[in-house]
Amino acid sequence: MSYLTQKTIKNNVSFSGVALHSGLNVNICIKPAEPNHGIVFKRVDFKVNNLVYPNFMNVTNTSLNTTIENEFGIKVSTIEHLMGALFGLGIDNALIEIDNEEVPILDGSAKEFIEKIISSGLLISEAPIKIIKINKEIKFTDGERYISIEPSTLSLDIDFKLKYKNSIIGNQSNKVKVFEDDLTDIYNSRTFCLFEDIEMIKKNGLAKGGSLNNAIVVKDKDILNSEGLRNDKEFVNHKILDCIGDLYTSGYRIVAKINCSQGGHYLTNQLLRKVFENKDNFSIVEIKEKNLPHAMINRSLLKSIA
């Protein structure tokens, strides 16, 4: 048994809170799962046909959140922050029971997910992990917005650029090595919106549970949250959190370089669809140290990937 093997949580972890878009109170319980189970949501408010798999092909909505849906029309929405936390902690297998359609927003970041899952402890199995290795550069463009993915050795590097006319948000950028860097600022960064967009968002039936307790609100040159920002790049850092969570709908940790400008849930999902439409674009590799070329072996990096 080593750090190259699959992990789940040691004990059940529960969260309760308001859902950002529906405004309903929701309870979730993350439970341990066997190797090769993967991440699976279970809608316990339904008796049958209630398993929903967070796979990019099951994503049916990317407007202000990522929503997945099974073949019976049962959905789970706003999965991205929880998925980002599971990715970051190296959780390969978990059953997530949820009693409503939307994951609770908590404070708008992945902070509480990370802290409580860590406190529960991790359970390491003997089953080797698998990663997705990108074989060629793939790009998806939507007007001025774009996202690309290209091969990397043993790293997931994300270079993200954000461009807003609002002077508080402005043009922010950040680069992270997901398996190596301290991502505290990424996981602590909250969702955000412009004050002038709130009315339209609510007219579309969204953000019914939104408040200054779970989102940064920017009005002209002011941040309405009394505590201000948690870090200097909180806006772009939150977008990176979303990107990590959405990438995990591939089913595995990805080894690649990501370059994104003005991206979001839609771009990341479309990129994954484009990658997986051709088997020549990627390889699924079972990571066993004996299978790695000697030149690739970096034990500390392998440990961080796992």
For the regions a protein language model found, what residue spans apply to each?
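C-terminal regulatory domains involved in ligand/effector binding and gene-expression control
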Residues: 1-92, 97-306
